[in-house]
């Protein structure tokens, strides 16, 4: 009898223990459960994109104090690698809620991997309030796949104190062509030991900037590769080679080295998208000794201008977003709806808005002491309105890679025509 009572007692104890474990105990800790007020983001460039996203979070938190934002710094090359790995494995759980995408590559990702990003056409974002040319970078088959962010209008920025040592002013580098640029660059180098600009080896961005300044594409209207018989492209490569040989332009390997050339090294200028101003402004010891102007034009080319574009990016909501409504409301309330945000990140990072209402702010007309009192944002707004349109193509990334291989070979002494033919064949193979 005692054994029977003991058995019943043990069974009851076991049942009570199981009940406690299954539902009678405490609930999962907040750390164990998904945070409904948190978004994760992938972005690159601490001084620009990440800074802008952090400022957007502060503004959103004013009305949503429970909101949290976790930003992972992921370089653009790493973003591409990660996306490729995720698509290959089918494990979309590794995606963040929001991912920054380069404009020149975004359409290809949407077309090639339709399950990666969300269609936000009917999300409530007013896309008519963005520059039409900017919006088009994230539109596929009439549907919107992102919230536009920065303007990539190109600038030429120079150290005026170094130019002065060689006998030049910013006006001497305004409205000039590449022939005059090289002439001045040789003189500046001879007198000061400073190159007029620098570039990164594994990049053909400079070539694309030159081409767009004249409205010339690397693609024919039927989508085929336009490398050979493209006399303007050949001219751009010749200019690149001449500048490298004459030490008018430094060529370095990494992005960090590129930034260092003009913030602490021996380049007294840089030509890039206006977003580069965020990196220029990290050189606080040279504050007041910088000025910006427009871009050199291609000599002898019909339709050539002193205006071009480089880059620009878009915020995309991924298919793995845990809280789509929160992500949309956050982006709509900040990058698509806050003048305060753009008033902050414009002087803070040189983030020129493509959200049109932001340009009405008085901040745009304020003199910037870092640039010697220039009204730089008024200049940028003017430049952006004069940039020629150009077709970058769905296979921009493949063309870009082929061209920077070409540039390395040409600088080393290879024949330009032969390299253009090889690059054309390389891109055509990758398009198959």
Predicted regions and their residues:
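Short, solvent-exposed loop/beta-turn-alpha elements that line the ligand-binding surface or hinge
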Residues: 118-130, 173-175, 196-197, 216-235, ...
């Amino acid at each position: 009898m005692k054994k029977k009572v003991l058995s019943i007692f043990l069974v009851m104890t076991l049942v009570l223990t199981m009940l406690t474990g299954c539902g009678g105990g405490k609930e999962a800790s907040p750390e164990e459960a998904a945070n409904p007020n948190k978004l994760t983001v992938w972005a690159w460039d601490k001084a620009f994109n990440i800074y802008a996203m952090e400022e957007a979070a502060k503004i959103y938190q004013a009305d949503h104090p429970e909101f949290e934002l976790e930003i992972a710094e992921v370089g653009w090359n790493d973003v591409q690698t990660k996306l490729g790995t995720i698509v290959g494995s089918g494990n979309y759980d590794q995606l963040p809620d929001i991912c920054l995408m380069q404009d020149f590559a975004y359409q290809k990702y949407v077309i090639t991997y339709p399950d990666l990003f969300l269609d936000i056409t009917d999300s409530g974002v007013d896309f008519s309030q963005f520059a039409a040319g900017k919006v088009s970078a994230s539109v596929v088959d009439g549907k919107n796949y992102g919230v536009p962010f920065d303007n990539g209008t190109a600038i030429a920025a120079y150290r005026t104190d170094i130019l002065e040592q060689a006998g030049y002013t910013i006006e001497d580098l305004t409205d000039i062509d590449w022939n005059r640029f090289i002439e001045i660059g040789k003189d500046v180098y001879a007198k000061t030991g400073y190159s007029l600009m620098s570039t990164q080896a594994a990049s053909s961005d400079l070539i694309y900037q030159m081409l767009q300044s004249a409205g010339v594409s690397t693609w024919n209207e039927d989508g085929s590769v336009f490398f050979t018989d493209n006399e303007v492209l050949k001219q751009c490569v010749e200019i690149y080679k001449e500048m490298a040989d004459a030490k008018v332009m430094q060529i370095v390997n990494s992005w960090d080295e590129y930034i260092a050339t003009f913030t602490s090294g021996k380049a007294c200028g840089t030509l890039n998208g206006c977003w580069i101003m965020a990196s220029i402004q990290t050189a606080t010891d040279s504050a007041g000794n910088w000025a910006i102007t427009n871009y050199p034009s291609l000599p002898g080319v019909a339709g050539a201008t002193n205006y071009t574009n480089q880059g620009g990016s878009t915020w995309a909501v991924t298919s793995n977003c845990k809280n789509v409504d929160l992500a949309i409301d956050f982006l709509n309330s900040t990058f698509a709806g806050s003048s305060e945000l753009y008033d902050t990140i414009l002087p803070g990072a040189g983030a020129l808005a493509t959200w049109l209402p932001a340009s009405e702010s008085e901040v745009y007309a304020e003199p910037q002491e870092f640039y010697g009192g220039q009204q730089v944002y008024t200049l940028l707004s003017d430049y952006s309105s004069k940039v020629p349109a150009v077709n970058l193509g769905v296979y921009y990334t493949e063309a870009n890679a082929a061209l920077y291989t070409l540039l390395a070979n040409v600088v080393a002494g290879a024949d330009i025509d032969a390299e253009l033919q090889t690059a054309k064949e390389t891109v055509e193979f990758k398009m198959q």
